[in-house]
């Protein structure tokens, strides 16, 4: 069958004789014209519109929700009656995972090149879901003899049909509103592109460019040849391929909503389901006739008789409606060998669903064309099923792909991850938002047991965030990210208990905002472990802060000098005693008291500091003092609103104190407004949940990456609101699995976080002993230590 090439008389003379006899693909398609940008008219005077939906991820969405959405879809079908038919098409198409590259020849750029190359080679697929609503033709009124009046009558009838169609489409869109339904348009190329994909298994934008061509001709852009049970697609703008088509021969006795979810194979595929309602009165008569027939022959298959009685009762009570159904599965491959491998998988999936699905031989051409909306005349195997069974078999299930760059504050996804269904997911820290407006919340939680790869994932995301030039600060624990920070061109230091820190807030916080913060912070510091200050003591602290800021001699901005400023407070020396704890030579003097100038630098694209000694300290006061001041320094740094990522390992240790409990929510809001993402890592959710501000924290971290833990218990995930499926993913996977559960504002997703495609770059990202064994223990003295491993 040819591609509808317009052939002139001279061309016919030099072409083979068989060309004259070859039928066109368009002649078998029903599409005539575009009524408007959304609506197509057919040869049979039917009208239809197509709705694209995002679907539900059946791997993670609770079964109750899947059943509820199935019931909603089935209910719409029942309510719209027998004047409307429905098709559901799932078309597999290859995903373009390219992203703007990380510029340069840095470690981050090498990681990006390696990862993007891997993602492109994986042949990952998305499966679009398109619901076609078909307005079946009404009985026409008598046509007047007058040409003018007949035209007016026909025009009004067409308009009435389109209005009814539009009402049902809007009704369905409202019912499926949580699936982001949108009507496909011809002007975008999507409407005709979808119809063409039913022929080819590949969806590309297609337009109706000339008025003298039918829509059928516009979407027929390949040559189709049927040989035995094979379908050969040749010519046109798409590569030549070979395909097969299957249809249901025997239906299952029962259906369930996930029965065909495994038909999401990574190949060019079209899965079509067609449902044409049967008038209830006619169906009741058919059921009654079948029951009478079975009674007449004294049928012993009582289960079947009972099923017929139940169907008759449910139909009479309006619980269900029946319709003619056909399901077809068309698959395409580059070679017949590849096609044979896919075919066996199709059969296995059908057997698992309790369905007998057969390949089509000489009938392949009829099933092939019957896939198209409004092409019922080509159907050869129709079954009578209920609207509920149709909603099961055509379930609107699909793994989401994440938010595109235009829908997130940083203008591009951070990276792509494969999913376990061989699709792909765009990872973004942020919730959906306009890049031109105030940033949405991008704070993220990474959960995983020790050794599960939390730090590696955080380092990978930090490297990929260089796509947007993000600045990165790392609050590290046990040097887990040291090698990654250094490889990424960053500075790394260590704060050790009892040793000089380089920190001195008295030197830095001298402007108006700084004085206000410093006063509040010092008062809390003085009260910690000692009780609340008296009003005159608080006033003395504020006065001393002001004097410190106004001092012309900068050498006076030390803790020893500050203690002398509050010594005159008429409180019997109580405030001075509290202050002296922090001066050199006293209990906490090592933290701030040994410094004159603050030389703790946060300059650079990557800055990491190991806080193991601080985090492991049993002294909550010292931990709070160090961390709160570093947070403050970063808070001042991010005022420039440059994209920034702050990574905090063992976050529950870092933030579990009264000071942060009172301020963490506002601090996270401030960070968000300053274009900053905070990534917190911990082993278990209950560690955060049990802290003084745990519930606030969990609510403030909308994105959550959870790595599997077979040894975890349900209580370890308290506060996250996980359903049974999500818990099974986290607690039931095999040891060593790199599957992760990702929760974001667009749902819950199962992604594959296996980064082994990075080769030795992954070992460097992970650091520790394995990293040192690869690059050498002296890597800290060699800024380019990672080079030479990028092509390994």
What is each PLM-predicted segment?
Residues 63-79, 258-264, 355-356, 366-425, ...:
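P-loop NTPase motor domains
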Residues 451:
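Walker A (P-loop) phosphate-binding loop of P-loop NTPases
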Residues 454:
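Conserved lysine of the Walker
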Residues 457:
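Hydrophobic positions on the alpha1 helix immediately C-terminal to the Walker A/P-loop
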Residues 495-497, 703-712:
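Conserved AAA+ ATPase "SRH/arginine-finger" region at the nucleotide-binding site
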Residues 693-706:
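A short helix-turn-beta junction within AAA+ P-loop NTPase domains corresponding to the substrate/partner-engaging
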